[in-house]
Every structure is written in structure tokens, then in C-alpha cells.
Amino acid sequence: RTAAALIRMAAERVDNRVVQDPRVFAERLRMVSRKLIRITGGIRPMPGKRHVAALCGTTGVGKTTTVAKLAARFALQEHLRVALLTLDTYRIAATEQLRVYADIIGVPLKVAAAPDEAAAILDEFGDRDLVLVDTAGSSQFNLEQLRDLQALLTAVRPDETILVMAANTPVEDLRVVAARFSVLSPASIIFTKLDETRRYGGMLDFLLERGIPLAYCCTGQNVPDDIELATPGLIAGLMTEGSTNRE
């Protein structure tokens, strides 16, 4: 529904001859998506000034793998001083998975189980350009878990909190998740699992309704490759061809 509406809006802005030119029409579609769907430009740490970004979301959406992708990008490609902090003490396997990635990337990883412990670790990471915080998956229906997570993030005081959601989630569930996780004041969204669906209308509907900016899209499990910065071209590609490889 959303994709069709945006395509119609793009078509209304050009005459029939221009619509026949796919390159021109794609540019018009990018312009329309830029106006209607907000994007953030991604995490933007400044060298020499610590930036803390925390990822939160429900179970199984790929937060830990996404943290690893971001860590690899910023540490290996942008040559920033990165550190990892995990607040997920429920899943030992997830912590060990992140530890393997941290060792490969060459960044420190610490685990915190309590608010005061998390705050102390953040002090240790004071010389880092970017601290990425992984959190335990919380059910949108488990208010106690959300309160515990809120207490941990209050101690961490992230510069930005990002809500991670799966693109193959029904739009009704996306709405409920966003409403429940709003207590954490997420500044943006990362959508994962774009490789597991070709129906992006619900995701786009959600972004239009909530007005919350999109930061990244993840398209698979490969670290660090399967993550794309959200751009108008990427969104236009999702609407037309189901492709995320757009500049």
C-alpha cells in the first residue's frame, strides 16, 4: 500500500515521457521517499569524543550480529577506537558469539549485569571513540524485563538508543513493539532480515506512521558486509525492485 502510494506520488510529479525513463523516475522516487521517510545518516561518532550507542529490541531480531557488523565497520573501515559492552547476561551463547567477533575485530568487550557495573565499565571506556552496547532481547509484553533494561540504560546514559526490528514482522506487531519500547526513547530504527522477505509494505507503513528515522538495514548474517546505511535510494529500491543495493 505504501510503496504504491509513493510510486503514484512520484509519477504525478513528472510527465508521461519522463516516467518512461527508469533513471529519471528512480530519481523522482528517491526525492519522494526522502521527503516522507526520515533517515539519520547512521551512527556518527567524532574521533576523540566518546559516543555511546545502545541497541535494543525483542528476542531474535539480530541485535548481537548487528552490533558486530557496526563494530567491524567503525573499527576496521573507519579506524575508530571501538569498545563493546553487553548487558545480555541471559544468553551465554550470545555473549560468547560477541566475544569471538570482538577478538577477530580487535576491540575490547565487557559484560555488565547491574547498573552500577555498567556505569563503571563506561568509565573504563572513556578513551574510546565509540562504545556499542548490546542488550538482552525483551518481549514487548514483559514489562518487568523492559523496566530492568530501562534501569541498565539509565546507568549507561547512551548518546543514542536504536530500536532493532525485523522487516518480516507484521506491521501490527511492529506498532506494539515500538509503543512498548518507547520507554527507552529510541532515536532511530535498524531493520534486519530484509533478506527473509520481499514484502516491505508493512515496514514502510510503520516508518511513515511513526515518523521515527531509519538508520540501517541488514540483509543477512555476514559480518560486516550485510548492513546498509539507510538512504533514499535504498528505500526507493525496496519499493520497486526489492533490492537494497542503491546509492
Where does each model-flagged region fall?
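Phosphate/Mg2+-binding loops and adjacent switch elements
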Residues: 156-177
